[in-house]
Amino acid sequence: MSSLIQTKTICTKDNIILSKDTQNNAFHLKFDIENPNIVLPNLITFGIFQLLGELNKDVLESITVTKTYSDSEIDLLYIFKQFGADLGISQKYMHIRVKGFAEDKKITFTSSSSKCDSEIDKELELIENSESTMVVEWEHDHKVHVSYYFSAHVQDNLPIYMENLMGMLTKKMFYRVKTFIENMKI
């Protein structure tokens, strides 16, 4: 007997589809980026993660490359801004190892939680078991399709109305990246 992935669409606003795998609480984002002024495949490097941090300073306190293993493998430390302090939610951080794989007309970034050797404030709480896969396929030089599948375990018992918070915050961050790239001029 095969098990089927059960997904629920959470939000389709701004031409970004956010859905949730209800069996394992993982999220999936799908969207296109198009800009006739920019050769988009040239932008799809590890630098995209730094751009994510620069455009989302209200969500992310910092994104730091803590170690570079090669041109295709790095460790990243995300420190999130605190939200929900009045609900007893502590400030979070996440440390991941990211690997990039380039193929014909496609690049894939995979990440998973990794041990952090950097000094971390004891008040911060680790987001555990973080995993993601981002696949960027280009239709042509000026249009790419992005698929981002991610999951992370947060220790807090969030109220039911906040169960999709991680997905919605991630969508907001990628919306800003999409908008920034689509509005770039040479």
Predicted regions and their residues:
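Hydrophobic ligand-binding cavity/cleft-lining segments
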Residues: 1-77, 87
